[in-house]
Amino acid sequence: MLRWQTAGESHGEALVAMIEGLPAGVRISTDDIVSALARRRLGYGRGARMKFEQDKVRLLTGVRHGLTLGSPVAIEIANTEWPKWTEVMSADALDHDLPREGRNAPLSRPRPGHADLTGMRKYGFDDARPVLERSSARETASRVALGEVAKQFLDQAFGIRTVAHVVALGGVQTNPDLPLPTPDDLEALDASPVRTLDKEAEVRIIERINEAKKAADTLGGVIEVLAYGVPAGIGTYVESDRRLDAALASAIMGIQAFKGVEIGDGFLAASRPGSQAHDEIVVNADGRIDRLSNRAGGIEGGMSNGQVIRVRGAMKPIPSIPKALRTVDVLTGESAQAINQRSDSTAVPAASVVAEAMVRLTLAKYALDKFGGDSVAETRRNLESYLASWPEHMR
């Protein structure tokens, strides 16, 4: 069983991520993780923090000479700005009082759309600092690091590869008639400032981001993650909590600021008659079972069906808005403008990298549930044995 967990605060000394249940023999390096984290910092419309935020990575446990050991893998991502925050974020009690100004000024004006107010109520804080430190999207760096480990495992054990791109941002839609990107397009997508292969839409999206920046506003959008090479039969219809589509939806919705998710044609399928909403089964020229379309997004009955898995997520505009919204100062009870932490005009391109990591982690878990072994070699043999058990025309 694959399990993962993250720990750490946005301005704490470090983020820590751990993944347990990974087979022995997965090739992984510190450089792989550093490269993945660099992709998370890409994207037009990012704030000043991305310019100086560097990710210093250490593989602490579970890896020896570039190969996983089968024991828990722990990763540390150090905060290079920690010297500025040592007292404000000190784990130990201080022997002196800090002035309530600058970095230690009380954050008593919660931001609409953020975890601030409800977090303060839930945990009994009179300051939003403890809430925003953990609820910050900085935490996603941990998940991207773990997602890189999952990426290497999926590719090496199963030949599963993923890619993510932006399909809408700030109300600008990319052309749905363009071919879907493949993992071979990763370099081109990373080179795009808004992570799309649609050059016409790219220009219009950049214009929208510039407009939002001038207006001191923020923009949301829609991303899509595609998974290639997923064998049929991952997940199950037997119990609702073991359905693959349910797990993927949960993984995407667990990303900060995501408010919607769909598999395949999703909400569009709801407006079609049944005769135009499903993927007809045919025998192709090679005498094998095939499909005429992929409206289901590679998942039927809670199981992967062998086609490309398509998952989309909708991200709301970032609630840390330079043009601050109205709120209440919880210390005075008076109307006020919300606090404005350093933020981006949009983080949709970067969020696609996070979403890709979450899809990888979910697929790794479910693939291990089906084919798991103690080593990559054993896991691969289990997959090959499973596929060989099918009749020739069903492979």
Curated annotation (Swiss-Prot):
NADP(+) binds at residues 40, 46. Its cofactor is FMNH2. Residues 98-120 are annotated as: Disordered. It comes from the Bacteria. GO terms for molecular function: chorismate synthase activity; FMN binding. GO terms for biological process: amino acid biosynthetic process; aromatic amino acid family biosynthetic process; chorismate biosynthetic process. This reaction introduces a second double bond into the aromatic ring system. HAMAP family: Chorismate_synth (MF_00300). PANTHER family: CHORISMATE SYNTHASE (PTHR21085:SF0). Belongs to the chorismate synthase family. This is Chorismate synthase. It comes from Bifidobacterium longum subsp. infantis (strain ATCC 15697 / DSM 20088 / JCM 1222 / NCTC 11817 / S12). The lineage of its organism: Bacteria, Bacillati, Actinomycetota, Actinomycetes, Bifidobacteriales.
